[in-house]
């Protein structure tokens, strides 16, 4: 495993574990997964050197935090647990109250990384961040982070906090490389981290899906899996397959290895089984030659998906009986 030392948080593994599916039903894992599989995954993750575990108060309406806290057991205070507050009425007193509720569910006295889940379109960070600053001053959290913030808003949050907002968790993968342009350079320059969620684009970068093998379930409504986008992304998937063959890994592992080869970037894929977790963690050992990494970056930049509106139009046309 590879690590980044993050001020206030500690040693952060470059491959972490996203736990949005803990306690949720939309991915079809169910109660057995929550009570047994999730615990086994977390414990195996620790054995493999994973230290970053990401959750949020809204995941399973608090169930994810409870399951994670119980699964970590006595090690819960020794790892980089990251949770998030959804910014409804994000005033200082409310933020402090809800952080304490998350800490109780996680069975922690101190949450290493506490993040604003998304920008509030009405309430500015000058109102939100004083509550985060109080939590820092009181030692209730180790560091403040944000999620789904633009670079400009991240910088505004910095100014409002009066100290570094250490992380920004964003949608980032070879299929969604927007963070490459400005966010990654900023993180490198300012000694911050970018936390990549959906790093495998819901499995698209594993190479399993294509025009002739469309997914069902929640993936079916993801524009990336539309027919036109599956055609457009094929050159990127072929580059992934070529690099994977070159380095002796699987395409999904190469996709993760590309992310964590970038300065200040860590990835938090989910896992539905211990085997999938082990597969993801193995990506930390994949070394990409410079030429291969550059080829992947070029292919990612070249992929231009159709808009969500066009995806919906195409989807309706495909479903019509003529």
Positions of PLM-derived features:
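Beta/alpha (TIM)-barrel catalytic core signal, keyed to glycine-rich beta->alpha loops juxtaposed to Asp/Glu
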Residues: 3, 119-308, 312-322
